[in-house]
Design a protein with these regions (language model features):
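Rossmann-fold dehydrogenase core element
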Residues: 105-122, 142-147
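N-terminal Rossmann-like dinucleotide-binding module
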Residues: 1-47
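Active-site loop of classical SDR/Rossmann-like NAD(P)-dependent oxidoreductases
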Residues: 274-286
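Contiguous beta-strand/loop segments that form the cofactor/metal-binding neighborhood of enzyme cores
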Residues: 184-260, 285-296
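Predominantly a Rossmann-like dinucleotide-binding segment in NAD(P)-dependent oxidoreductases
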Residues: 123-209, 322
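Hydrophobic residues in well-ordered beta-strands that form the structural core
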Residues: 53, 91-92, 117-119, 230, ...
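Beta-loop-alpha module in the N-terminal Rossmann-like domain of NAD(P)-dependent dehydrogenases
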Residues: 16, 47-109
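C-terminal helix-rich "cap/oligomerization" subdomain common to oxidoreductases
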Residues: 7, 66-69, 223, 290-330
Length: 330
């Protein structure tokens, strides 16, 4: 049994907990830390785990194999470094961290202490994403020219419920580095190259109380020639015909609404795959457990997390300076 310490017992932790329950024969939470004592106690009772209000104390006292970081964005770097220094493997919620300096600290800590870090990029475990990656790597649509990703919904946050997400200092920006992080790592996964430059147009259509944007449209260039287009928003639902993701190549294209996947080739060949949906958090936790058990590389490590952060920072800089900004190399 892989023993995990949960760091942060807030909302997203519930999705992770469901994942652990789905793999209770392999991995489980034995300790939980949250700065709010009532939350720590409640999660501890829920999980039969030892509660702490300080994750550093938990790391010092508990016999743990790994930690699962479910903290507000601005607290990720410190928790990652502390866990790595304690020799614990790490599953970290999005985003990995917020700045290039923080990314350098994360990479250095993970490398120095020889621990595994997996980014909690749960949408990679959608069956349609796995099938699209398989088709692209098999050359079904030929050399890829363009990838598009979308993740938009009508968010009913208000100032009383927005919490730390309303502040750029604690969130790292606005919607783009939050929900927009999902279509960014999906873009990276499907494009198959390293990001080299990006720009964005940011908007605040509806959630005016936020310091950051509530919507973003991003362009990304990769070193293999792929150009990515990304749309994400908390202000509105996408149009009914909008694909979740698509890719266009020299031989044809593929697209998906998230539950089915179709490709159409210039030769006239077409095929549609109807794929059974899965709980992506359950699949994510299972993958983390298997990676630790077999000592194999997770689907996305700190390297992909840093690449995603590089895209986002370049997009923010491109928007600020009204230029196409280079993706920083960390």
């Amino acid at each position: 049994m892989i023993k995990v310490g949960l760091i942060g017992g807030g909302g997203i932790a519930s999705a992770h907990i469901k994942g652990y329950r789905g793999h209770a024969d392999k991995i489980g939470i034995t300790a939980v830390a949250d700065a709010v004592e009532e939350t720590a106690k409640a999660r501890g009772e829920e999980l039969g785990a030892t509660p702490y209000t300080d994750y550093r104390e938990m790391l010092a006292n508990e016999d743990l194999d790994a930690v699962d970081i479910c903290l507000p964005h601005h607290l990720h770097r410190d928790a990652i470094v502390a866990a790595a220094e304690a020799g614990r493997h790490i599953l970290c919620e999005k985003p990995l961290c917020l700045t290039a300096d923080e990314a350098a600290d994360v990479r250095a800590a993970v490398t120095e202490h020889g621990v595994t870090l997996m980014c909690a990029h749960n949408q990679l475990f959608m069956p349609t994403v796995a099938k699209a990656k398989e088709l692209i790597e098999a050359g079904t649509i030929g050399t890829v020219y363009e990838v598009r990703t979308t993740d938009s919904f009508y968010n009913d946050f208000d100032p009383s419920s927005m919490g730390w997400r309303a502040s750029s200092k604690t969130s790292g920006g606005g919607e783009l580095i939050d929900t927009g992080y999902h279509p960014t790592y999906l873009m990276l996964h499907l494009a198959g190259g390293l990001p080299v430059e990006a720009t964005a147009m940011l908007s605040t259509h509806r959630l005016k109380f936020m310091e950051g944007e509530d919507s973003a449209q991003v362009l990304i260039k990769f070193d293999n020639g792929v150009v990515g287009q990304l749309v994400t928003s908390w202000a509105y639902e996408p149009a009914a015909s909008t694909e979740r993701f698509s890719a266009v190549g020299e031989l044809g294209s593929l697209h998906s609404d998230g539950t089915s996947l179709s490709y159409r080739l210039r030769s006239g060949e077409t095929e549609t795959f109807e794929l059974e949906s899965v709980d992506t958090f359950v699949a994510e936790i299972g993958h983390f457990a298997e990676s630790l058990r077999t000592k194999s590389r997770p689907i996305h490590t700190e390297e992909e997390g840093i690449a995603v952060l590089g895209i986002l920072l370049a997009a923010y800089e491109g928007s600020r300076s009204k230029t196409i900004a280079p993706v920083l190399k960390v």
